[in-house]
């Protein structure tokens, strides 16, 4: 492969040879002169024909029957001799010839001007992409992204038409995921979250810190969009919250029961997503799996609070509790779990193994494992949380498969955010795992069995800690009808939770950004805009400054620079706020879509849009909808 071919792509093509502007000018003028001569020749032949090829016109170059071919400029000589004749035929012929010459010369002048302009543009084009071809998307390029369509997708910003000064909302309706960089108090709620929730007609799971999204969007989603509006607020004491029991999602008495419980207990003993790093975590997880199976099979309180109550029962010590598991008949249906020798075993083998494991440990180790396990379940000792996780008023399966779409708001007061995080993490984990377990295929293509798409609107996403299932499955959950909209403050926040080798960012097809506060994010966004080629003009003067002999020479030099430098990214015009900190005017933003030119956009303000404003005024339900009681 030669060097030119190695540099040729749809984005940039290296010129084969540098062209001299002077040579291009001479070529253009030569063509223009040739055209003038052809025009004069046409005038000569026209006048000769009008005058009947009279012998007085002189001898022609060539005679072809009745046609005579004269020299190109002969008509000018004829005009000098006979223009004063009072013959209308003669004067008319010369008059028309002059008009023909004038019109033709004008056309040639236009051709010359166009050619010179085109040559200059080609010369500039050869150099303007030399160091990089980055630029902001034009109207056609914005349209090419598909974001200006009239679908029902999520809002990612707006684009202002420079010519018509008209704002165009940008919506992404594809299955791909969206990530937004938006610092606190930057207007992400009024510009991204609320417009999306006030228009998205399908199911949604919304991580709603402060409950603002429930208050402003659940009314419209329930009343106008035909959704079930469910609010799960674990710390609610007024009865307005739906209840959710994570253990109700376990498929008891199936081959999946152990895997379901293991997934739940792994999330419980790993509240920050750092993995099972020590002996106590691993032992606690194994113990809780066994105890959970016993509770689901044999205890009355089949909840997480029921597990901690069983482990901390003041009427018996740990050894008696473990022996109780071994002595319990879990096989009430008579299906049996045979022992290796074929004899019947009526105690669940996984529960029995966990209990026997604990009895075989030394007293100090056993005490440490029990203490660790109970510590992980302390949250569920709170009577409010215990009450709100006692039964399930909805099931994970309902989110995408109920007759109507379901909007689930995970409402967490800021004061309880850290305390309730393990429960919210557990629920999101169950959503992702439960709705991406099975895919059907027909005629060589995947077929989704769900009735509704599901939007995962997760504001302050990194605050949930590392969700391994999310990072692992983000690449394929779109195929199951799940679309993630992840909002983070800056890239370092994501790196803190997932490490610099994370794959969350790369699996988001659309990235939008408000003015960042951290230089790491600004540098990343600057690199994402790309490198542009800048043409620098310089002038030099010689001779007397005011004299007629002064000479001016101009030179151009191409250099590179980022389309936006890091400091320019940090200085993106932010939203204008009043004295109370409320947003009054939209700021600027950046919109990136894989495979497309970056868009310099404008923020949306939902309260300045009559449609959004009217929808936000629909009152939220006083109580959450209930789909089931299990």
Question: Model-derived features: where do they sit?
Answer:
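Residue-level marker of intrinsically disordered, low-complexity segments enriched
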Residues: 5, 152-154, 550, 567, ...
């Amino acid at each position: 492969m030669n060097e030119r071919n190695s540099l040729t792509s749809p984005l940039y093509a290296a010129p084969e040879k540098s062209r001299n502007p002077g040579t291009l000018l001479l070529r253009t003028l030569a063509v223009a002169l040739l055209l003038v001569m052809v025009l004069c020749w046409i005038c000569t032949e026209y006048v000769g024909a009008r005058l009947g090829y009279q012998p007085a016109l002189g001898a022609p170059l060539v005679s072809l029957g009745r046609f005579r071919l004269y020299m190109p400029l002969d008509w000018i000589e004829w005009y000098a001799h006979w223009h004063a004749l009072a013959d209308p035929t003669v004067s008319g012929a010369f008059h028309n010839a002059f008009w023909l010459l004038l019109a033709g010369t004008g056309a040639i002048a236009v051709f010359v001007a166009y050619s010179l302009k085109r040559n200059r543009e080609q010369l500039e084009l050869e150099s303007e992409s030399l160091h990089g071809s980055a630029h902001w998307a034009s109207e056609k390029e914005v349209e090419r992204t598909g974001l200006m369509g009239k679908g029902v997708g999520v809002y990612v910003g707006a684009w202002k038409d420079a010519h018509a000064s008209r704002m165009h909302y940008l919506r992404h309706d594809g299955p791909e995921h969206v990530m937004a960089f938006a610092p606190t108090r930057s207007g992400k709620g009024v510009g991204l979250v609320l417009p999306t929730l006030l228009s998205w007609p399908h199911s949604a799971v919304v991580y709603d810190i402060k409950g603002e999204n429930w208050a402003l969007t659940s009314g419209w989603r329930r009343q106008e969009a035909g959704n079930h509006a469910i609010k799960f607020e674990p710390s609610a004491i007024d009865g307005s919250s739906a209840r959710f029991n994570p253990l109700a999602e376990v498929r008891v008495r199936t081959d999946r029961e152990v895997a379901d419980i293991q997934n739940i207990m792994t999330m419980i003993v790993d509240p920050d997503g750092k993995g099972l790093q020590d002996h106590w975590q691993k032992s606690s997880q194994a113990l809780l799996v066994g105890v959970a199976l016993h509770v689901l099979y044999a205890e009355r309180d089949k909840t997480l609070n029921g597990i901690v109550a069983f482990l901390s029962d003041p009427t018996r010590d740990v050894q008696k509790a473990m022996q109780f598991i071994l002595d319990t008949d879990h096989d009430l249906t008579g299906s049996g779990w045979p022992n290796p020798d074929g004899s019947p075993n009526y105690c669940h083998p996984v529960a029995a193994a966990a209990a026997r494991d604990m009895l075989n440990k030394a007293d100090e180790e056993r005490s440490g494992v029990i203490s660790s396990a109970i510590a992980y379940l302390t949250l569920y000792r709170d009577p409010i949380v215990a009450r709100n996780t006692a039964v399930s008023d909805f099931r994970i399966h309902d989110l995408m498969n109920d007759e109507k779409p379901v909007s689930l708001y995970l409402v967490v007061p800021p004061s309880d955010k850290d305390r309730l995080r393990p429960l919210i993490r557990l629920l999101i984990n169950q959503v992702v795992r439960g709705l991406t377990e099975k895919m059907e295929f027909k005629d060589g293509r995947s077929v989704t069995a769900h009735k509704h798409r599901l939007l995962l609107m997760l504001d302050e996403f990194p605050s949930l800690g590392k969700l391994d299932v999310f990072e692992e499955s983000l690449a394929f959950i779109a195929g199951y009808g799940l679309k993630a909209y992840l909002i983070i403050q800056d890239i370092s926040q994501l790196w803190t939770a997932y490490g610099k080798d994370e794959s969350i960012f790369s699996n988001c097809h659309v990235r939008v950004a408000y003015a960042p506060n951290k230089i790491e994010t600004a540098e990343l966004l600057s690199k994402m805009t790309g490198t542009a080629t800048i043409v620098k003009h310089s002038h030099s003067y010689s001779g007397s400054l005011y004299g007629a002999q002064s000479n001016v020479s101009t030179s151009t030099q191409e250099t590179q620079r980022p389309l936006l430098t890091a400091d320019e990214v940090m200085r993106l015009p932010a939203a204008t706020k009043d004295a109370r900190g409320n947003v009054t005017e939209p700021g600027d933003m950046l919109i990136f879509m894989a495979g497309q030119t970056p868009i310099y956009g404008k923020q949306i303000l939902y309260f300045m849009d009559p449609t959004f404003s009217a929808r936000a005024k629909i009152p939220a339900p006083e109580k959450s909808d209930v789909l089931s009681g299990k």
